[in-house]
Amino acid sequence: KNEKSKTGNDWVAQMAIDWEAAADQFKKLTSRIVKMRISLLISKNFSLVKYSILSTKFGITPIIGSKHNTINWIHIDDAAIFIKESITHKKYQGTFNISTQNPISQHNFIKIIQKKVCPFALSIQIPEFLLKFILGKRYSIINVKLKLSANKLVNTGFKYKYNKMEEALENIINQ
């Protein structure tokens, strides 16, 4: 899904629509607006990463929802670099999916964490109905099956420090 694709109708999509409409109000004041659709940030403080690593150290790795769900992601360092560059370089204008070109399934995400932290950890799937009950509308944040396109970002010449999940998690685990 790229920046020009039709938006969804769930809670997250509506939040993005509202935020981008608010950003458009600044067109009267400036000639350049950058709208960032930031995918899941990979950082040591990001809950999914933090708790997946912690629980894996204890021998259990939770699979949140379906193991086939897609994680569109970007390392926090790369997101910070883009934000800085988007302020200082006029080549950035319009809407950008701030994501790597390498989305990953939950299953592969868990396998990487287990490989790096505890290869013998047991994977336990948390049922979707339980997550829907606990999280309500916010469940749509983690129940993702679409892959974002980062082509517009890449076509600007943006260079990732971490374009592979293995490298990103290695960096986080070693912090």
Task: Please state what every model-predicted region is.
Residues S86-K137, I173:
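Mid/C-terminal beta-alpha module of Rossmann-like enzyme folds, strongest
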Residues A79, I83, I98, F109, ...:
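Non-catalytic, hydrophobic alpha-helical segments
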Residues K1-M36:
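Catalytic helix-loop patch of NAD(P)-dependent Rossmann-fold dehydrogenases
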Residues I17, L29-S31, I42-Y51, S86-F96:
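Glycine/proline-rich active-site loop of Rossmann-fold NAD(P)-dependent oxidoreductases
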Residues K6-V12, I38-F46, S66-I76:
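Glycine-rich "substrate-gating" loop/helix at the edge of Rossmann-like oxidoreductase active sites
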Residues N163-Q175:
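Amphipathic terminal alpha-helices
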Residues I53-T61, H68-P103:
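Alpha-helical substrate-binding/gating segment
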Residues Q106-K111, K132-K159:
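Conserved C-terminal active-site "lid" loop/helix of NAD(P)H-dependent oxidoreductases
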